Amino acid sequence: ETTVTVRAQDDNTGHSRIKLGTVMLNLTAGGAQCSVTVSQSPATATQTMLLYMPGRDLLNFYKQNIDGVLKAVDANVPGDGRILVCYQPNTHSQAEMYEAYFNAEKQAAAFTLLKSYDDFAAADPACVQRMLSDVAALAPAQHYGIIVGCHGKAWVPADHGALSYLAR
């Protein structure tokens, strides 16, 4: 197997992929030919999606969600977008931010650590603000989305106290 890497001289500052050209392959064994279109993704992603899963009570469910994300990632997904996952796999005072991406060399979805937080408190607005600022810095995008994993009172204000079973 041979791997060819093509690198553009300049960043793609536009909002969509740029076609750089076509590579024609002539295989000596069997005389087969094929062409591959080479394109460059934009330097700024079209969308960054953050899957934020605070706390540890739902860790088994969070891991299932992460596995689901990795099953969805392939050569076409997330396309020109990015998928980040931030959760607390080890302790309540620590968090890790990963990126799910397609590893073309291994032809499989992969996970890479982008940032570790050793002093993270999921209920502290300053910690959450810092994490969201890091999302913007580490995965710049035209648009952002967030999915928050939790169990709680949904959209009921916190000062309403516990809900009765019938009100749920």
Where are these regions (language model features)?
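Active-site-proximal loop/turn and secondary-structure-junction residues that shape catalytic pockets
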Residues: 89-91, 150-154
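N-terminal extension/subdomain marker
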Residues: 41-140
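Surface-exposed loop/turn motifs at beta-strand-loop junctions within extracellular Ig-like
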Residues: 8-12, 27-31, 150
